Each structure stands twice: as structure tokens, then as C-alpha cells.
Amino acid sequence: QNREFWADNSDWLSLWIEYIKEWDNSHQKFEWNCKGCEDGNIRDKIVQFRASGIRVKLPTFSPALNLVGTQVPILPWVKLPSECIPKYSDAELEQYGLTREDISYGRYLSVKEAAALQGMGQLKFGNLSKTRIYEALGNAINVDIVKIIAKKMLSYE
């Protein structure tokens, strides 16, 4: 499959490889975990920058919360409130091929959402930093799963 893909696309891939070879290793690998959805659009998918590369998943599954607070999943389809939109000049946007619309969307999964994914939606984190909270949630086991396992184990005869 890979050889056939290269043969069919080597013209533009060769140029693209030259373009990205100066990037960080973690940005050179692109993982498309969207079986059955080959539209190439990431705007309606969950995006996560990981040490191993950029991972894209359907929003029907959350990527694993990671011990590293810098790998928080991104929700690109969420429209930002106007006061949260970065203030870039037209020249800066043009330099990167972006429009005002492009920068009006996308935010990280919130601490509250991450806690809910682990079954800890009501948990209070005191005055821990967001990074420490994400790290703790990434190291946690889902509370609902623990309850199911505990019930099975305690009722075993």
C-alpha cells in the first residue's frame, strides 16, 4: 500500500518532505484514526499533538488523556467567543495563509470535560495548575469502570 501510494503521489510528496524536514520530529508524523471517514477535514475531529506526532480522531472517541499536560485534545469545531480570538494583523494572517474565520475556531478540552471523561466531573482540584490537573487525570483510572469491576469482584462467589 505504501509503495503504491508513493508511486502515485511522489511528485508532491517529494516537495512536501523537503518542506517538513526541518519541523520537530513530533510534527512530522500524522496519524489519521478516523476509519470510514476519509474526507481529510480535521475541523470536525479531535486533534492532539503528541510526542509521537499529530493524532486526529473522530469525536465519537476521546484520545487517551496523557500524563503530559501539553498534549490536551483540541476541539477545532468550537467557535470562540470574540474576546478569545487572537488579535493578529491582516499581514500576519496572510503570512501564514490564514483568515479571520480560521482563527475564530478551536479550543482545548476543558479541565471539567477531561474530569467528566474520567467519571470525576464533580471533583474539586483545589489550587492545582491546569497542567497538574491534566497530568493527574491522565494518570487516573475511569471511576465508572472501577465501580463496574469492583461490583463484579465483590459479588463473585
Where are these regions (language model features)?
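C-terminal target-recognition/interaction regions appended to catalytic cores
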Residues: 1-157
